[in-house]
């Protein structure tokens, strides 16, 4: 039997005998199929069952209808950083969708038939792994729900056995993160009792370029030893699965901390920032750049110390060799990246550090915008607002970081000497970190290792493992002993020895055919690939998306022979990445003499990885070559079947309670950011929902006819006049000034920028990174932002895995759109997913194109009064796969969708960005039907009338604004899934070629990359978006409908299309902005006025006063007080007023915003004041006076 690296392996669960009897007839009927499938080396895995009652929990489940992306992009992993917030593992309903990148790709053989693969409760049940996704025990996947009885029995079995599941020397506790190709488990080291995070990666789901990225990432992490960088402890590998044992940061992300507690005081920010600078300087000293530094990738341990995670975009640099890949999240990206210039490396991280410092101190982003185009212009302009509470020393330090010219940007060595950095640390000036010498070994720990492993290894072998840093059991135990705050006493050592004898189920390398499951070390080591870098160590996007990896506690030990057979068939040798030998070998505790040692799990249970029935094999073995070859004696290891069944839902999650993950990358489609509560810091977080992914498709808020009508309204003269009238009255000039606009954006709420793994740009040009340029975008013809690409807008279309039809998608979109409106309330901080390079690059191009002439002028889209980005606060970016984004247009479309809509440049992929497609309407099934002119306006226009319009299809990045739906960028500048918030990873304009997206883009649904586990990419997108939207965007209804779009109007043009953009440009050129008279209420869109509600404000420190009055009553009171104080004002939205006070001819002119907002979790409303322009003293005087006079 072969353990197909490509095939899915059904998990076995102990089921009550009655259940078996009920299903026995079916099983007998299908036994022929099972036998037949057993002959297929890649497709099946025979599992030896210990009892006749053992059967697949998913038997009888039909997965044929699941959509499956063909080879999802590796970087789409969103669960990557293992400490991140726990993906929602719905206790009874872990999303069964395998599609998130793990759909049942090609459920061709028995799977399609829907016949149960499990053989009757015979001794060895054979399962055709080919197309069936059997939910693992404890996964109550949607499929499992269909079977009812079997699903319940599997869940009960999981509850019984879950506590006994081991991988190597680690006891698995719970799932803390999930993605398309990876799952992150919280585990406890049985020897030291130390908690770790284990990232379990399905290698069969990764294409060669993705494996290369993982290889590089692991290689880099193995070199790092800094107290403020997430540590890699161990690398284990089977033929189909890679296990990375990482440091567990229980305190969560800095981003979450800011959401829960608001901005830090400078003293607290200084303590954190010193650690960040020390870690990044250490990276630069080793010629490594991170390239995705942001608040979401900064974790906190239990002592609130910083841990930098997510090295998925990291790379090495050398002076004189320029890099050209656009990586990272746009709000944190340096100007040279937006301008498409090559860069040395460190200066890009320095800029990101400046943005992080600003974020820590202010709780908002220095550069933000309604769309990618606005953001790009503000970053290139380099203007940001200094909060009145920021100290002069901190302001001066920021000026060293945020320098547009990279040559003039300070180095971190100089930053360390800055005055602000060392205030309060006069006796401990920040100095470069000195790494302990490699040859410095702790003899006490060595002695303990000798006592613990006395049965398996002698001192020489232990010293060799530690000195050569093999990243296997002994080395990991050595490292973890160093993490203990107290030494192990004799009783603990004795207990550890007893645990070693029977507790661990070894990860079988499955190399070579040994019928009894005996695996020779030579075999394991010989197959290992050379690169220690191979295994991805971080919780990063790269392979972080777990496709529903499931752990079955009761799974029978599969014979190693099957896996071995398959491995032989597979071209790529599997190897444990960094360690020269598999951890399983270590687990087996091979005797020093080399005698065979048989290791059995406590309950036969192990992590069962079920490979997706793809025809792909693990392309690259991540094991590095063995540093030594022990004797040929074999160690018999119980094989653990692959953990991932891409077809199956993340079943294990159901059995396990969802818990906060501090280090794991959030699922691309977290249900919504939830502020940390007191316990959250301890690592307990509300589960972010990966689950939502199964619900929706790409949301389209209205059908084609409605969209047409809607777009016609937008382009009508009345609409245009409303747009133009949006500029503020008396202070209009100031508002429109670049400084004011930039200042407005600076206050934009924190949006999380989750890194999205991106596909490389469509056309490989400069191959700075192997992985970044590898694949060709199948859809790569389409420029992200500017050009018109293939008529089919892959963004929406891509999600259509084999079976998804455009009609299905439309239905999904409608469903999603119907769901999303209620989620429209933005949380002030939005995640900003990292964007893949290809998307970013195309976005950049389209921006430039739009500036050059399509929009009728570079500033047409962006020009105008200050954007109300402030309300957006930091928006977090969910890490979505670029693959998803790329899926629509080969990755470029994804970025384009975000930027095109926003930038006004036509987007080649209609679906993805709804941008105007000058040449042809996008053909993407979901919303591509609209002609380019019909493309909705971006948020700036705030034309999106209905909430659904605001919501961006969850298709990860690509569908950010699927053509069918206008995205109301104004509401949340960068909702998590939007392009703007995503980390880009792609070549600069000059180097658009990116292979990564090539097959993945075409094959994986755009949404899948987000880590949606839903059956279809569309579902994943919709649900992901809906989840994200809850937190990230404001009530788009209110904003988009009522807001006349004064300051933001500029960004509208591009998204509507060339016609609208050109019309706006012509009108502005002729008449200039029209400012409504002072005190005059600017016209607002009447549509659905009654539905508009105050925005729910997550950051409450800007509230000056609260009241239980109705919002409209509060607005009347505010206008009354403004009139009494002689203030000019313009009601720009139903619950937001732009106010002006003072003499424009003197320095006393002050502009500010007043907004009635709803307080979270309280039945109260509050008034938010935000200064737009003028001195802080002048603003405080008038704002305090008005606040005192308000009778609320």
UniProtKB/Swiss-Prot annotation:
Post-translational modification: Phosphorylated at Thr-325 probably by par-4.
Compositionally skewed regions (Low complexity) per UniProt: 106-151, 525-541, 558-598, 648-659, 729-748, 857-866, 886-898
Ranges of compositional bias, category Polar residues: 46-62, 749-759, 829-841, 868-885, 899-916, 929-938, 959-977
Signal peptide: none
E.C. code: 2.7.11.1
Cofactors (names): Mg(2+)
Residue sites binding ATP per the record: 176-184, 199
Expressed in which tissues: Asymmetrically localized to the posterior of the zygote before mitotic division, then differentially distributed to the germline precursor cells (at protein level).
Key words of the record: ATP-binding, Cytoplasm, Developmental protein, Kinase, Magnesium, Metal-binding, Nucleotide-binding, Phosphoprotein, Serine/threonine-protein kinase, Transferase
Main location per the UniProt record: cytoplasm
Primary role: Required for cytoplasmic partitioning and asymmetric cell division in early embryogenesis. Phosphorylates and restricts the asymmetry effector mex-5 (and possibly also mex-6) to the anterior cytoplasm of the zygote. Regulates mes-1 expression during early embryogenesis. Critical role in postembryonic vulval morphogenesis. Involved in the establishment of neuronal polarity.
Protein name per UniProt: Serine/threonine-protein kinase par-1
Gene name in the database record: par-1
């Amino acid at each position: 039997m072969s353990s197909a690296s490509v095939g899915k392996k059904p998990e076995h669960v102990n089921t009550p005998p009655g259940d078996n009897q009920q299903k026995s007839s079916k099983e007998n009927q299908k036994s022929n199929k099972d036998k037949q499938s057993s002959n297929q080396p890649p497709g099946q895995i025979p599992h030896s069952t210990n009892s006749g009652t053992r059967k697949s929990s998913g038997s009888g489940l039909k997965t044929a209808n699941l959509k499956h992306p063909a080879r999802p992009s590796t970087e789409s992993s969103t669960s990557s950083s293992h400490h991140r917030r726990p993906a929602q593992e719905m206790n009874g309903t872990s999303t069964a969708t395998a599609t998130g990148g793990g759909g049942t790709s090609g459920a061709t053989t028995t799977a399609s038939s829907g016949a149960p693969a499990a053989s009757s409760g015979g001794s060895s049940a054979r399962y055709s792994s080919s197309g069936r996704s059997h939910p693992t025990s404890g996964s109550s996947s949607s499929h499992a729900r269909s079977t009812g009885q079997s699903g319940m029995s599997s869940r009960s079995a999981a509850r019984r056995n879950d506590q006994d599941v081991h991988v190597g020397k680690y006891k698995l506790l719970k799932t803390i993160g999930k993605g398309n190709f990876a799952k992150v488990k919280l585990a406890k080291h049985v020897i030291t009792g130390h908690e770790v995070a284990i990232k379990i990666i399905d290698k069969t789901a990764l294409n060669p370029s993705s494996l290369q990225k993982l290889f590089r990432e692991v290689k880099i992490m193995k070199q790092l030893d800094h107290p403020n960088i997430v540590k890699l402890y161990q690398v284990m590998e089977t033929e189909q699965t890679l296990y990375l044992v990482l440091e567990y940061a229980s305190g969560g992300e800095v981003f979450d901390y800011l959401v829960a507690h608001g901005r830090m005081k400078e003293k607290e920010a200084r303590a954190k920032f010193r650690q960040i600078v020390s870690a990044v300087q250490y990276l630069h000293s080793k010629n490594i750049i991170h390239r995705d530094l942001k608040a979401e990738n900064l974790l906190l341990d239990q002592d609130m110390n910083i841990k930098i995670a997510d090295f998925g975009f990291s790379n090495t640099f050398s002076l004189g060799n320029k890099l050209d890949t656009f990586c990272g999240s746009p709000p944190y990206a340096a100007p040279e990246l937006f301008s498409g210039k090559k860069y040395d490396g460190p200066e890009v991280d320095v800029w990101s550090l400046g943005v992080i410092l600003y974020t820590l101190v202010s709780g908002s982003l220095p550069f933000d915008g309604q769309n990618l185009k606005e953001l790009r212009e503000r970053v290139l302009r380099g203007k940001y607002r200094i909060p009145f509470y920021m100290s002069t020393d901190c302001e001066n330090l920021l000026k060293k970081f945020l320098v547009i010219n990279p040559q003039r940007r300070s180095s971190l060595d100089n930053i360390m000497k800055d005055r602000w950095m060392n205030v309060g640390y006069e006796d401990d000036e920040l100095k470069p970190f000195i790494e302990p010498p490699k040859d410095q070994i702790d003899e006490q720990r060595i002695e303990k290792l000798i006592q613990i492993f006395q049965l398996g290894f002698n001192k020489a072998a232990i010293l060799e493992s530690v000195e050569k840093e093999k990243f296997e059991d002994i080395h990991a135990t050595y490292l973890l002993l160093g993490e203990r705050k107290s030494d192990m006493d004799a009783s603990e050592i004795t207990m550890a020895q007893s645990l070693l004898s029977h507790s661990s189920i070894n990860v079988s390398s499955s190399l070579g055919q040994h019928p009894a499951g005996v695996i020779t070390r030579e075999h394991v080591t010989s197959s290992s690939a050379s690169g220690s870098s191979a295994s991805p160590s971080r919780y990063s996007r790269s392979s972080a998306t777990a496709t529903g990896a499931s752990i079955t506690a009761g799974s029978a030990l599969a014979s190693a022979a099957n896996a071995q057979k398959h491995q032989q068939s597979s071209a790529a040798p599997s190897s444990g990445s960094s360690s020269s030998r598999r951890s399983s070998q270590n687990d087996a505790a091979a005797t020093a003499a080399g005698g065979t040692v048989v290791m059995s799990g406590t309950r036969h249970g192990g992590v069962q990885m079920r490979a997706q029935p793809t025809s792909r094999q693990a392309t690259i073995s991540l094991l590095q070559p063995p540093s030594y070859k022990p004797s040929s004696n074999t160690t018999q290891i119980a094989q653990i079947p692959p953990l991932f069944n891409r077809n199956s839902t993340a079943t294990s999650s159901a059995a396990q309670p969802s818990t906060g993950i501090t280090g794991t990358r959030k699922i691309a489609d977290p249900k919504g950011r939830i502020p940390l509560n007191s316990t959250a810091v301890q690592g307990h977080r509300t589960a972010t929902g990966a689950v939502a992914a199964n619900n929706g498709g790409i949301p389209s808020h209205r059908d084609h006819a409605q969209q047409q009508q809607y777009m016609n309204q937008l382009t009508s003269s009345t609409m245009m006049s409303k747009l133009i009238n949006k500029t503020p009255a008396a202070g209009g000039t100031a508002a429109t000034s670049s400084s004011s606009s930039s200042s407005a954006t600076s206050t934009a709420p924190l949006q999380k920028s989750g890194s999205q793994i991106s596909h490389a740009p469509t056309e490989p040009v400069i191959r700075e990174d192997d992985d970044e340029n590898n694949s060709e975008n199948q859809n790569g013809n389409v420029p992200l932002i500017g050009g018109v690409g293939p008529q089919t807008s892959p963004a929406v279309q891509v999600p259509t895995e084999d079976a998804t039809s455009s009609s299905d998608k439309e239905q999904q979109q409608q469903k999603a759109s119907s769901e999303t409106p209620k989620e429209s309330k933005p949380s002030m901080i939005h995640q900003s997913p990292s964007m893949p390079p290809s998307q970013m690059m195309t976005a950049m191009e389209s921006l430039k194109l739009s500036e050059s002439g399509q929009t009728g002028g570079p500033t047409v889209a962006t020009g105008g009064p200050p954007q109300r980005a402030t309300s957006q606060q930091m928006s977090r970016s969910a890490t979505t796969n670029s693959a998803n984004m790329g899926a629509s247009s080969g990755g470029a479309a994804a970025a384009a969708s975000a930027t095109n809509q926003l930038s006004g440049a036509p987007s080649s992929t209609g679906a993805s960005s709804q941008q105007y497609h000058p040449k042809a309407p996008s053909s993407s099934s979901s919303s591509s039907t609209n002609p380019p002119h019909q493309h909705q306006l971006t948020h700036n226009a705030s034309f999106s009338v209905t909430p659904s319009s605001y919501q961006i299809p969850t298709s990860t990045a690509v569908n950010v604004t699927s053509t069918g739906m206008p995205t109301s960028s104004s509401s949340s500048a960068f909702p998590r899934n939007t392009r703007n918030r995503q980390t880009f990873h792609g070549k600069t304009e000059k180097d658009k070629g990116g292979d990564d997206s090539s097959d993945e883009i075409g094959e994986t649904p755009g949404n899948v990359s987000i880590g949606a586990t839903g059956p279809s990419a569309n579902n994943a997108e919709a649900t992901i978006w809906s989840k994200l939207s809850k937190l990230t965007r404001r009530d788009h209804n209110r904003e988009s409908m009522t807001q006349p779009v004064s300051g933001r109007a500029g960004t509208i043009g591009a998204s509507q299309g060339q016609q609208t953009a050109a019309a706006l440009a012509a009108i502005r050129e002729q008449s200039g902005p029209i400012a409504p008279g002072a005190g005059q209420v600017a016209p607002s869109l009447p549509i659905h006025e009654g539905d508009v509600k105050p925005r729910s404000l997550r950051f409450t420190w800007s509230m000056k006063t609260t009241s239980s009055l109705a919002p409209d009553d509060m607005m009347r009171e505010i206008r009354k007080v403004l009139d009494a104080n002689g203030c000019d004002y313009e009601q720009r939205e139903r619950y937001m007023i732009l106010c002006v006070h003072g003499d424009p001819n003197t320095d006393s002119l002050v502009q500010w915003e007043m907004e009635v907002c709803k307080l979270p979790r309280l039945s109260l409303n509050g008034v938010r004041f935000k200064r737009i322009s003028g001195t802080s003293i002048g603003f405080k005087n008038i704002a305090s006076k008005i606040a005192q006079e308000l009778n609320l």
